[in-house]
Curated annotation (Swiss-Prot):
Statement: the UniProt record of this protein carries the keyword Transmembrane helix: no
Keywords: Disulfide bond, Knottin, Secreted, Signal
Gene: CTL
Keyword Cell division set for record: no
Superkingdom of origin organism: Viruses
Chief location: secreted
Protein localization: Secreted
GO cellular component terms listed in the entry, alphabetical order: extracellular region
UniProt xrefs under InterPro entries: Toxin_18
Disulfide bonds, paired cysteine numbers: 25-39, 32-43, 38-50
Native species: Autographa californica nuclear polyhedrosis virus (AcMNPV)
Signal peptide: 1-18
Domain notes: The presence of a 'disulfide through disulfide knot' structurally defines this protein as a knottin.
UniProt protein name: Conotoxin-like peptide
Pfam families linked to this entry: Toxin_18 (PF08087)
Amino acid sequence: MQIKTVLLAFAMFAALNAQHVLAACAETGAVCVHNDECCSGACSPIFNYCLPQ
């Protein structure tokens, strides 16, 4: 029974990470609030748009 719990926990962890990786990101110039919303990983804190890489 314990191995089933470990396998279930691993499957849930993998599924949650896959959703984050597969989520669409915003292109350069798109409106953003956080860095992780942009494909480049950089959101302007003053103007709230995605910066180029």
